[in-house]
Amino acid sequence: MSWKAIAKAAQAEVLDAIPTKWKLDPAKYRTLTDVTSVPRECGILSDAQLSITDLTALEVVKRIESRELTAVQALEAFGARTAIAHQLVNCLMDWFYEDGLRQAEELDKSFKATGKLKGPLHGVPVALKDFHFVAGRPTTTGYVSRRDFRPEHDSALVKTLRDAGAVFYCKTTMPQSGMAIETVSNLWGRTLNPYNTALSAGGSSGGDAVLVALKGTPITPSTDLGGSIRVPAAFNGLYAIRPTSDRIPKGGMDNINSGQISIKLSCGPICHSMEDLESFTKLINAYPENQNDPTSVPVPWKTVKPIEGKLTIGLMKWDKVVMPHPPVIRALEHTKRTLEKAGHEVVEFDVPFDCWDAIQTTFDTYYQSGHSGTLSTLEATGEPLIPAFEDLIKVFGSKEISAAESQQLNVKARIFREKFRDAWDATTKLTSTGRPVDALICPTAPAVGYPHDFNVYWGYTSLFNLLDYPSVILPVANFKVNPQDDPVASNYKPLETNPYDKPNHELYKPELFSSQPSTIQVVGRPFQDEELIKVSSVMDDLLRAM
């Protein structure tokens, strides 16, 4: 069977599994570009179900505990909305609702008998990215040749969530290989942005993000090696965190290039609130259960006191490689004014090294084997590379390196980390408090979104994978791109020293991004995830109050 035939059958299998009662008339919505209102207006969900799907994960658990809601009712509501979302934006690669229903029924039965919740996610419908191992369910990593691969066990993270009472019922799309800032594969097709289907959903956790945005699930455990949690969250206006990578157990997760551990995968939530973000991150920190897990460091979750007094925040507007579009800069300046109005302090921060050198080091580290794992997996069926991956090879090359060269990359990474640490420490000279900044704010990407197959610059997120600094994505409430506030920066002359700045600059037209949400990235120091969350919560309260 050809790869095209395999892909066609796989996509049809997912769509056919959706119950008839939750099917949309495709002709009715084909011309829509903003589909965010369809779940509420299509008539499939009752008013009660719409109210359920407006709940955060913590609110679902509270309603179940107070007996206002059952796990089965929660799954029915979110399951219906997930089915609608998939038909609008193509976000699923597996649908196993009946399995989820059995889980929910067991939770309800147990709670009725004992009056005790199974755990902090009791009855919460949680979608899982393709990447996660779920016993008996397909894990493809977006490759046609892996269509029939089914692991025999849950990954460590999935086990943690299952033990906490999460209900699993579907898996979401990711791009071929996972190494793309857009979610598209030959196997599953293209996942669309619900705010503008002509724009990218982000990647690699694009299926997760669009499903959360359309409220088919309140939260997802997403993964990030170069921006894969943060970029999709940003392009869909959501909350997210990329924790310090060593804090999260990753045993049993899929990875074609698993031998590369110099820049480590991280896992964290995409969700609708800081409260869910904090609760979920604490849960997947998984201490003390992870004390013998070789993929993480057993660090207890710290109790951090609420912040009193003045915050000091570093502002990094751009990295001297790719100039962000005007609305990205405006969102940062808006955040700065909001903080200063509330009595906090914001100081300028510059990265203390060449960020173009840093991203080249990052990609050289990712692909020390010269893409051999990816290419051999494609050769099994003859499927082609997706454009996003081809672009990365054109820019960064495809060369297998020696052991000595690999060691030199590790030396460079260590030097980058030392320089960044020293620059952060040196902010004591800039702040009125005499202490280093509490966090940095910076762009997540050079734009609020991108057209499909645009060659996107990863540097604003991948930098913090190289350094292994935790970072949070915060939505900027009531902030929309418009020509009056965000005119084209006609006086800016793009840099010729890299292949990204000029195309990024030439792309910008305010009307192209008028429906896109805006976000900022908040960065903390390694293993200070709890402190970062507290700082981000203060900022979130201020931004939502504006």
UniProtKB/Swiss-Prot annotation:
It comes from Gibberella zeae (strain ATCC MYA-4620 / CBS 123657 / FGSC 9075 / NRRL 31084 / PH-1). The active site is at K129, S204, S228. One of its GO terms (molecular function) is hydrolase activity. Amidase; part of the gene cluster that mediates the biosynthesis of butenolide, a mycotoxin that shows antibiotic activity but does not seem to play a major role in the spread of head blight in wheat. Butenolide is derived from glutamic acid via a 4-acetamido-2-butenoic acid intermediate. This is Amidase FG08078. The keyword Hydrolase applies. It holds the Pfam family Amidase. Pathway: Mycotoxin biosynthesis. Induction: Highly expressed under trichothecene-producing conditions. Belongs to the amidase family. Keywords: Hydrolase. SUPFAM superfamilies: Amidase signature (AS) enzymes. It comes from the Eukaryota. Its EC number is 3.5.1.-. The lineage of its organism: Eukaryota, Fungi, Dikarya, Ascomycota, Pezizomycotina. It is an enzyme of class 3 (hydrolase).
